[in-house]
Amino acid sequence: SSFDPEQAEGTYLEKLVYLFAGLKRKQPTPAIAGLMLRGSLGVTVPEASNVSNTKTGDVFATDNAVTFTQTNASGVVLDVGAISLDSVISLSYSEIESLNQYPPITIVTGQLDTAISVARTLVQTINSTSSVISAFLDQDNAVHVKFINFNTIGNFSTTGNIDVIQSYIPVTATSRTFSAVLQATNDLNVIQSPVLGWFEVYNPYDSIASTNLETDTELRNRYKFSKSFIQTGNRESMYSALYSLSGVRYVNVQENIQDLPFEGRSAHGIVVTVLGGDD
């Protein structure tokens, strides 16, 4: 029985599936989260800075250092200065790796305007005219401007008596343990590694939970799955080969068999999505 993958266990099973199919038991993997950090321009949050979730107790460490700038940012915080009659303030923005061009958001001040009223007008103008960015006013009357799509980064600039004082920068983070559960949106919001000028952190999307060591049953099923597709079409063989790689958690293979492009896939093309992977 130790030579039959259907009955072998533990080390014997590992040796057999590696011998017959080149498969290795999948090891535990940490959880992964995308974070949004907000801080003062010029401040750097070091790599491996910790953030946590008070609901789950899980702790994540940033995967790389983050410096707050008004370029390659997901958003900015604006401070409106002293206002004079007929002064003009404007906010310009662009998306990285996009050909789209957007007109600047421009405000011309009136006789009764104050810094607060101009800030409110700027927020209203952004929210009523732009489908790309949104804005809100905080308790200090600073204007927060962010791309609506959290995956978008871009460059921001201002003219007139309005300054960029903070920015939002995205970063990925990895759990400190292999037992972290899914972190619901906005629940990773505690800064555990304080940095002067780093004010906020949150996760715009649910995280990806940790995975456990692959069990004998899971390894055996993956072995049977890989063998069942060896003699089938390219799409199935590709799926099997990718899913067998160490660290891979999810595979999706979409094929377009038509003569014309369809849903972003070229004619007779294949689009592959893979989550995880150590190779």
Describe the role of every protein-language-model region.
Residues 1-279:
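Short beta-strand/helix segments in adaptor/scaffold domains that form protein-protein interfaces
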